[in-house]
Structure formats: C-alpha cells, structure tokens
C-alpha cells in the first residue's frame, strides 16, 4: 500500500543531499534535508488522509446499499476538510477514530492492536506522522523544525502504511460480522 511518490521523494532527498555533500555544499545540503523532512511528513500524512477518506466513503457505500444519501452526508460532514478532527493527535493511539464506529469496534481494534506489537507500532507511527503534520501546518511551517531524520520519517511512513491497510480491513462490513460472531 506504500506510495511510490513518497518513495521517490525519499530517494531524491538522499541523492540530492549526497550530491551537495560531495560538492562540499554543506549549508545547502542541510537546508535541503530540512525541507525534505517537511515534504515527507506532509506527503505521508496527506496520502493517509486520502486513503482513509476513500475507505470511509467506500464503507458507507457498501453498507448503505442503493441509498446514497448517507454517503453524501458522511462525505460532506465527516470527511471533507474534517479528516484531522477524526483523530486525537495528542494521544498515541487511534481510539477516538475507532470509537466513531461504535464502542464494539473500538474495543475489538484495541484488542487486536494489543495482541500485535508490530501493528501497535504501526499505529504509533501513523499517529506520529499525523501529529507532525499538524504541527507543521499550524506552528509556522517555515520555522518549524521536524526533529527527526529523513530516514526515520521514511521508515515511519512504511510502518504507518501497514496500519492504514489494517484500517481498510476494519472498515469492511465483514469486520462488523466478525464482531457480531465474537459478541
């Protein structure tokens, strides 16, 4: 589920910084590195927003059948320009988002995450990138310093992609059927 563009941005940043260092342009290399960190954070968070928004819309479409009014309502009032309100970015989990689909869904997701340390780490990476995105956008983009390396951002992105794929499964009607069987 990883995004090829983000992969290219990461490779471009590494290549450009290496080239500048080879030419002894340390100041330019440092500047480019700081810019690409912001680009990668925004690119990853934007990609996740796009995928999860589409997943929510697809879920609404599947469960609403031929009546598309609920889909339109969800797209207009829950998704468009509202994505970042679906999560509590100051927490290290996605409980707020999952609880929007009911307490049973939240509890089942939490149970599955607690049983799988890798998936739990993927959730934390997703939340961290969303938090960094908000800080960049709301805390003076030009001045804000992303206090992590390009490599760390890229690795968090890859890990967070796994969590976004998991959310797609949660937003499948079969997940609700599983809840009913487990309950």
Residue ranges and their predicted role:
Residues 120-135, 147-183:
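Amphipathic, Lys/Arg-enriched alpha-helical patches that create a basic surface
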Residues 63-143:
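Flexible secondary-structure boundary motifs
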Residues 34-57:
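Short, hydrophobic, well-ordered secondary-structure elements
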Residues 60-68, 177-181:
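Short, glycine/acidic-rich hinge or "gate" loops at secondary-structure transitions
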Residues 1-37:
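Charged alpha-helical initiation segments
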Residues 22-29, 56, 60, 138-145:
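Short, flexible helix-adjacent loops and helix caps
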Residues 1-5, 32-40, 117-121, 145, ...:
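Non-transmembrane, amphipathic alpha-helical segments
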Residues 12, 16-19, 43, 47, ...:
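Amphipathic, well-ordered alpha-helical segments in soluble domains
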């Amino acid at each position: 589920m990883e995004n090829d563009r983000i992969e290219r941005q990461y490779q471009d940043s590494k290549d450009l910084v290496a080239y500048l260092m080879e030419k002894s342009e340390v100041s330019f290399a440092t500047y480019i590195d700081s810019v690409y960190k912001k680009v990668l954070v925004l690119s990853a968070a934007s990609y996740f927003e796009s995928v999860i928004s589409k997943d929510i819309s697809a879920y609404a479409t599947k469960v609403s059948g031929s009546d598309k009014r609920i889909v339109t309502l969800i797209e207009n009032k829950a998704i468009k320009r509202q994505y970042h309100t679906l999560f509590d970015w100051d927490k290290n989990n996605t409980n707020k988002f999952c609880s929007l689909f009911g307490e049973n869904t939240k509890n089942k997701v939490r149970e599955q995450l607690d049983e799988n340390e890798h998936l739990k780490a993927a959730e934390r990476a997703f939340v961290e990138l969303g938090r960094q995105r908000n800080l960049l956008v709301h805390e003076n983009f030009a001045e804000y310093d992303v206090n992590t390396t390009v490599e760390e951002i890229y690795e968090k992105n890859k890990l967070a992609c796994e969590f976004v794929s998991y959310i797609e499964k949660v937003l499948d009607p079969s997940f609700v059927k599983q809840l009913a069987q487990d309950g």
